[in-house]
């Protein structure tokens, strides 16, 4: 099983052992740690949306890509890795994810629940896989240095 398959199943709520892969820490985080914090954020975000029962969700909190654990970790390393293409790609994909989630919140807050659900089911998993690919590439490059 590769990381993309593991992430896709994990986002569906399945408990599966992390695949043997890059076992390296960057700023105190392993690849598994980074992916698990992303999965946790997505899971908590979905729970808030369901629990809201149609009440407005916090748009600013969702859009803030520096407030989640993964985003805080990325921001803490920005000055160190900002010139690395793999880091910039990862940073951008993470920001894209939060922007997409914010657009879904806007749909939800405007009572366009079906559109929000469709977007959440199609866009967020794809962007999560992009983040997984970007994280893996970043870790591999850093490990070689």
List the model feature ranges, each with a label:
Residues 1-145:
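N-terminal membrane-sensor/transducer module of prokaryotic signaling receptors
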């Amino acid at each position: 099983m590769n990381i993309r398959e593991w992430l896709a199943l994990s986002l569906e709520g399945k408990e599966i052992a992390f695949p043997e892969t890059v076992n390296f820490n960057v700023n105190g985080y392993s690849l598994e740690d980074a992916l698990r914090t992303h999965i946790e954020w997505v899971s908590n975000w979905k729970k808030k949306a369901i629990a809201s029962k149609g009440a407005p969700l916090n748009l600013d909190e969702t859009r803030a890509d520096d407030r989640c654990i993964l985003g805080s970790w990325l921001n803490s390393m920005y000055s160190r890795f900002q010139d690395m293409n793999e880091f910039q790609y990862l940073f951008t994909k993470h920001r894209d994810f939060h922007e997409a989630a914010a657009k879904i919140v806007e749909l939800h807050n405007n009572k366009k629940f079906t559109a929000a659900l469709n977007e959440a089911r199609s866009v967020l998993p794809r962007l999560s896989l992009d983040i997984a690919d970007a994280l893996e590439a970043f870790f591999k490059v850093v490990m070689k240095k």
